[in-house]
Curated annotation (Swiss-Prot):
Organism: Cereibacter sphaeroides (strain ATCC 17029 / ATH 2.4.9) (Rhodobacter sphaeroides)
Record carries keyword Protein biosynthesis: no
Alphabetical GO biological process terms: protein unfolding; proteolysis involved in protein catabolic process
Family from the record: Belongs to the ClpX chaperone family. HslU subfamily.
Annotated residues for binding of ATP: I18, G60, V61, G62, K63, T64, E65, D246, E311, R383
Gene from which this protein is expressed: hslU
SMART domains: AAA (SM00382), ClpB_D2-small (SM01086)
InterPro entries reported for this sequence: AAA+_ATPase, ATP-dep_Clp_protease_ClpX, ATPase_AAA_core, Clp_ATPase_C, HslU, P-loop_NTPase
Oligomeric and partner information: A double ring-shaped homohexamer of HslV is capped on each side by a ring-shaped HslU homohexamer. The assembly of the HslU/HslV complex is dependent on binding of ATP.
SUPFAM superfamilies, alphabetized: P-loop containing nucleoside triphosphate hydrolases
Protein name as annotated: ATP-dependent protease ATPase subunit HslU
Compartments it resides in: Cytoplasm
GO molecular function, one term: ATP hydrolysis activity
Function per UniProt: ATPase subunit of a proteasome-like degradation complex; this subunit has chaperone activity. The binding of ATP and its subsequent hydrolysis by HslU are essential for unfolding of protein substrates subsequently hydrolyzed by HslV. HslU recognizes the N-terminal part of its protein substrates and unfolds these before they are guided to HslV for hydrolysis.
Annotated Gene3D superfamilies: 1.10.8.60, P-loop containing nucleotide triphosphate hydrolases
Amino acid sequence: MTDLTPREIVSELDRFIIGQKEAKRAVAVALRNRWRRKQLADDLRDEVYPKNILMIGPTGVGKTEISRRLARLAKAPFLKVEATKFTEVGYVGRDVDSIIRDLVDAAIVETRARMREDVKARAAKAAEDRVIEAVAGRDAREQTREMFRGKLKRGELDNTVIEIDVADTSNPMQMLDPTGQGQMGMMNLGEIFGKAFGGRTQRRKMTVAESHDILMNEEADKLLDDEVVKATALEAVQQNGIVFIDEIDKVCARSDMRGADVSREGVQRDLLPLIEGTTVSTKYGPVKTDHILFIASGAFHIAKPSDLLPELQGRLPIRVELRALTEEDFVRILSETDNALTLQYKALMQTEKVGITFTEDGIAALASIAAEVNRSVENIGARRLYTVMERVFEELSFQAPDRSGEEVTVDAAYVEKNLGELARSSDLSRYVL
């Protein structure tokens, strides 16, 4: 669980997302409240429930990006899902309880990886011994083993091919799992038979370098107690779990529509107990959802937040509106963020030994065209920059291998030459940009 302050969380999000101060502050406070709750006495801690968040804003303004960055900051079990993937209980498809099962699966993987780090030194020694045994033979004298150990540490054996017995992770009964409907709260058929066939090994040929990670993981897993991993992961999910539900507006049953709709209102009704607090059966044991934080987001182009079931609205008490991005925002996105598209294209072209320099007026021209096309065609926010940049670099990307050693300056004239006519013709930009 992260102990970053709200100011530090917002500062970290600012590196990748421009604007949207209110949304950043809301998720930062929600994340900090998880830490605050952990400091309380046990009896009071159980009474403090998370304040779930509803983020409302047009497409391409940073809703999903906030969730992706939050996942890395949280250091807690985190899952992002799309509401449109689920159907009402009783129909073919995934029901909403699988959200919690997926969250638990993610937590198990995360917990195991963290615990492997704790036993890394012991696992490395055991893995080293197995490699030396494969190279020198089981009956080798201590002096010979030490000689090979020295070579191994110096990397002299990296390309040596060895034969070792590794755990056979293939599951011959995998075909018995119904597609898309595995683990309905219990261990599925594939896993039952998988355990019956468990403990098998297969002899594989690989280089010493390739064997390193495989043997490290195997030896680390031998040192871990599966029950402790499971219990730790379940506790982390119940106390610190965060679920981000995207496209929540797509499951709104609009007031002007008639007739039954399997994946809309039914999904909302199924989400109610999950968000309010219920117990979900998973193959690792029951999970209580009372203290899991839910963040829902949607563009609400056609539906309105008021089209959500009133009970669901009540369970998402914190409302945050994200504003549409302007031309100035696009300039900042291209020049200030740590993962700016300009940096990405520079790095990509550098692999072909082509140097790229972006001038201020070049970046301004790119931002201006993106904003103009958003206004005249359809506002898809910052995603428009991907399309604009790809069109500007289309010719250069194709010719780059033949232009090795060249320096290219992307200024206003370069952008105009590659994109000007296209941007000015609204008919063309409708289909191309």
